[in-house]
Amino acid sequence: MALTTERVKLFFEWFLFFGAIFIAITILYILLVLLFEVPRYIKELVRCLVEYLTRRRVWMQRTQLTEATGDVEIGRGIVEDRRDQEPAVIPHVSQVIPSQPNRRDDQGRRGNAGPMF
């Protein structure tokens, strides 16, 4: 009877030991996930906050301008998005490469073995 009690005690000691190791590994894993994932969420949150504040500032400027002038059309001239503030790239004529369509007489010189219709 005493031998069985010792075995049960030993079993529970080992069970608690491995359980404690499992819990410690789980806690370390959670801490590592928090260490690497929370900065991403904070970065995304800051980006959304800045975008919201920028849109709100533009909206307030537009509203104040409309109230000051009484003209609704003036408020539409304010740029709503930063992407609109970038200068447009317009290619010069020298940068444009004209496309040359393939003529029928060119097809024979290209070594094309297909039928010519």
Swiss-Prot record:
The chain crosses the membrane at residues 15-35. It is found in: Host cell membrane. Keywords: Host cell membrane, Host membrane, Host-virus interaction, Inhibition of host innate immune response by virus, Membrane, Suppressor of RNA silencing, Transmembrane, Transmembrane helix, Transport, Viral immunoevasion, Viral movement protein. GO terms for cellular component: host cell plasma membrane; membrane. It comes from the Viruses. It is a single-pass membrane protein. Transports viral genome to neighboring plant cells directly through plasmosdesmata, without any budding. The movement protein allows efficient cell to cell propagation, by bypassing the host cell wall barrier. Begomovirus genome is shuttled out of nucleus by Nuclear shuttle protein (NSP) and the movement protein transports the DNA-NSP complex to cell plasmodesmata and facilitates further movement across the cell wall. GO terms for biological process: symbiont-mediated cell-to-cell migration in host; symbiont-mediated suppression of host innate immune response; transport of virus in host, cell to cell. This is Movement and RNA silencing protein. Residues 83-117 are annotated as: Disordered.
